[in-house]
Amino acid sequence: MSDIAPAAHSPYIPPTPEVGLPLWLLAELTYRCPLQCPYCSNPLDFARQGQELTTEQWFKVMQEAREMGAAQIGFSGGEPLVRQDLAELIAEARRLGFYTNLITSGIGLTEEKIIAFKKAGLDHIQISFQASDEQVNNMLAGSKKAFAQKLEMAKAVKKHGYPMVLNFVTHRHNIDRIDKIIELCLALEADFVELATCQFYGWAHLNRVGLLPTKDQLVRAEAVTNEYRDQLAAQDHPCKLIFVTPDYYEERPKACMNGWGNIFLTVTPDGTALPCHGARQMPIQFPNVREHSMQHIWYDSFGFNRFRGYDWMPEPCRSCDEKEKDFGGCRCQAFMLTGDAANADPVCSKSYHHGIITQARDESETATQTIEELAFRNDRNSRLIAKSS
């Protein structure tokens, strides 16, 4: 396929693509963020990343992705609210026909902005919390005002007719209070609540020993969640509780992103295109939207084709009868834990490196690291990490 970008009004799409369409576009607008969450999935060296894409460059990305079949866009970061052109980007995404999501901490959000985003056509707002009580929330966020701001904005989102979607990242320091978390969500009249146990990428991987819950903590938390689900169902209550367990307590890997470069496409603040938001850490030269069309990136680039299909797989994945279900698991996790992204995801009990996972489980039983001892995601720490790498 040619490297020349096709005409904007008539992009070439293979009649029967060998891969899926990029249905889900994650627009990481910025790595700037007022919070310092120690489980952030942003790269450790975010402080040395390049200049952010301009408004016009994001318009081009969205148009090309939409013409290729992308249906849903998530505006993320960092904190996307620091971008002064966010309402413009939302309006353009709506004009192009995207279903639009704003994934935010709520810091920097105001009622005036909510109204402006509604007018621009925003479909969905997800607000994240760090904990159910102010002290722990603010300690994890690195901000003394974060909790009060989040509460106020969650209520404002509901007031202006959006479905209330709340996200709580749970870990060993807050998971034992999952009942309080759910009660807070019900008090805020949440429609959907994602109780997402920490996934260990980026800063969370760096802090894994201090964040990974024990097996007993997870079992109790899921039992409490199921009790609330039963109560809500009996009351015909509309709130839906989604409980996400960490990979580290599974015996089979997830079908990460439904397969490498299959439906999901991330564009980072500097324009680097990735098949998942954690892939930047790999020793692979990924394409940039400043230099290539989205068409070329998705279908022709080495980075997006590197782990498509099954031919790249070594054993035990190559001969495994489950490979079409899980695609060998997460490539980023394989790279982080074994140093080779082509290895089987160590989460899988068939992996030759599964002992790394069982060792992490054992370490969680005796871990003593406090919140204060975690490495917080901020510019200073990022620069130190970048300097030492």
Curated annotation (Swiss-Prot):
Enzyme class name: oxidoreductase
Listed GO MF terms: 4 iron, 4 sulfur cluster binding; cyclase activity; iron ion binding; oxidoreductase activity; S-adenosyl-L-methionine binding
Alphabetized UniProt keyword annotations: 4Fe-4S, Iron, Iron-sulfur, Metal-binding, Oxidoreductase, PQQ biosynthesis, S-adenosyl-L-methionine
Listed SUPFAM superfamilies: Radical SAM enzymes
Entry keyword Iron: yes
Enzyme Commission designation: 1.21.98.4
SMART domains reported in the protein's UniProt record: Elp3
The organism's place on the tree of life at top rank: Bacteria
Binding site for [4Fe-4S] cluster: C33, C37, C40
Pathway this chain belongs to: Cofactor biosynthesis; pyrroloquinoline quinone biosynthesis
Cofactor, free-text remark: Binds 1 [4Fe-4S] cluster. The cluster is coordinated with 3 cysteines and an exchangeable S-adenosyl-L-methionine.
GO biological process: pyrroloquinoline quinone biosynthetic process
Domain Radical SAM core stretches: 19-234
Co-factor(s): [4Fe-4S] cluster
Chain coiled-coil ranges: none
Subunit field text: Interacts with PqqD. The interaction is necessary for activity of PqqE.
Entry function: Catalyzes the cross-linking of a glutamate residue and a tyrosine residue in the PqqA protein as part of the biosynthesis of pyrroloquinoline quinone (PQQ).
Family assignment from sequence similarity: Belongs to the radical SAM superfamily. PqqE family.
Protein name (record): PqqA peptide cyclase
